[in-house]
Amino acid sequence: MKRRTFLVCTAALFCGALLAGGCTQKTSQPVLQQIEYSNLADSDTQALLSKLLQDAGVSDLRIQTFFDHVQKFNNAVDPAWLTTGFENAKPSDLKYDPYSMQDAWTEKYDTFPGWNCRITACGLFGDFITVTGKADLDSAEDTLFMDYETLDSDPESLCGDERQKFDVLFAPVKTTNTTDIPTHLKTIQQEWKKRGLSFVEDDKIRLVSVVLHDQFSETDNSLMIGHVGVMLPTSDAVYFVEKVAFQEPYRLLKFKNRTELSDYLMLKYDNSWGQDTAHTFIMENSDLMDGWRILENQENAS
């Protein structure tokens, strides 16, 4: 039995054909060994991301709000902790100590926690999400209390969206006690449909959600978006923009394909080995992300 931390920040038919394989994509592509990323501390990478967002139809208000947050965060921490342009690193390497970075943020902003992956992604992607229903606020408040602390202090973070949209997308989903990923995928899809959640499908911008299975008891299980970011595919690359955590940096990453993005996220967030919970899985909008796979030998890749 275990409980994960929640700060880590129509595929049903498809999965039916792959049920025996647990929906994983079979590929001989080597496991990701190196990432190319920027902390958006320079004008060139900011201009690149701004154009990608504009080309995808993200509003000027959402883009400006995002970069205002980036500037506030980057100005609060030691520049030596951030990249200069794009840099290469192992997927698990950091240029900073998370605790020192947290102290630097707190020194400048006191008790305001800042913005995390969910607030950042919803702020950027909000125009591509439609909500007509509601979520169970009791479960949401239990797990999203720090998110709500930020939204209470800075409601403009959602760029005019109602809190309801955030709740419906990120409130936990009750599920069954199983390690079967197709079952969990179908459960979250059905619950989102019940809540009236739908996505505007656009090839230039996609919401990428890292779904975690939490088991509090044999009869109390839930699915939670533990991390989320915005994918911006182009003809020659797959870009991914994220806020790593409340007091950790923004990142723009560049991958060759979705499988590399899957590896990056699974190396960071799939810690279900030897547990009673299902492996982490990754959704692209409301479906399983093409290229997602479970990594068999994570210790050799990170």
Model feature map: region roles:
Residues 1, 11-17:
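N-terminal secretory signal peptides
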Residues 3-7:
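N-terminal export leaders
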Residues 19-22:
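C-terminal motif of bacterial Sec signal peptides marking the signal peptidase cleavage site
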Residues 24-26:
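Bacterial signal peptide processing site
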Residues 29-39, 43, 219:
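N-terminal accessory/interface modules of nucleic-acid-binding and processing proteins
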Residues 48-215, 222-226, 233-248:
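Acidic/His-rich structured neighborhood in mature extracellular/periplasmic domains
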Residues 240-243, 247, 256-302:
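Low-complexity, Gly/Ser/Thr/Pro-rich intrinsically disordered linker/tail segments
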Residues 253:
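An anionic, turn-rich surface loop/hairpin at beta-sheet edges
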